[in-house]
Amino acid sequence: MNNAKIWTVVKPSTGIPLILGAVAVAALIVHAGLLTNTTWFANYWNGNPMATVVAVAPAQ
């Protein structure tokens, strides 16, 4: 572990929960952002099928 000296400054009983908490908060922020800014993500979580895209052939 190349950052082993961090535990001389911060006790592992404090640092590990802080790190895990920060990861959890970051994940919640990312998922909340996806849910509020996209229409497909909520549908994906609800198990709805994806909308079909129909390709139109170019006119000649």
Swiss-Prot record:
It holds the Pfam family LHC. It is a single-pass type II membrane protein. One of its GO terms (cellular component) is plasma membrane light-harvesting complex. The chain crosses the membrane at residues 15-35. It is found in: Cell inner membrane. Residues 36-60 are periplasmic. A bacteriochlorophyll binds at residue 31. One of its GO terms (molecular function) is metal ion binding. Keywords: Antenna complex, Bacteriochlorophyll, Cell inner membrane, Cell membrane, Chlorophyll, Chromophore, Light-harvesting polypeptide, Magnesium, Membrane, Metal-binding, Transmembrane, Transmembrane helix. GO terms for biological process: photosynthesis, light reaction. It comes from the Bacteria. Residues 1-14 are cytoplasmic. The core complex is formed by different alpha and beta chains, binding bacteriochlorophyll molecules, and arranged most probably in tetrameric structures disposed around the reaction center. The non-pigmented gamma chains may constitute additional components. Belongs to the antenna complex alpha subunit family. Antenna complexes are light-harvesting systems, which transfer the excitation energy to the reaction centers. This is Light-harvesting protein B-800/850 alpha chain. It comes from Rhodobacter capsulatus (Rhodopseudomonas capsulata). The lineage of its organism: Bacteria, Pseudomonadati, Pseudomonadota, Alphaproteobacteria, Rhodobacterales.
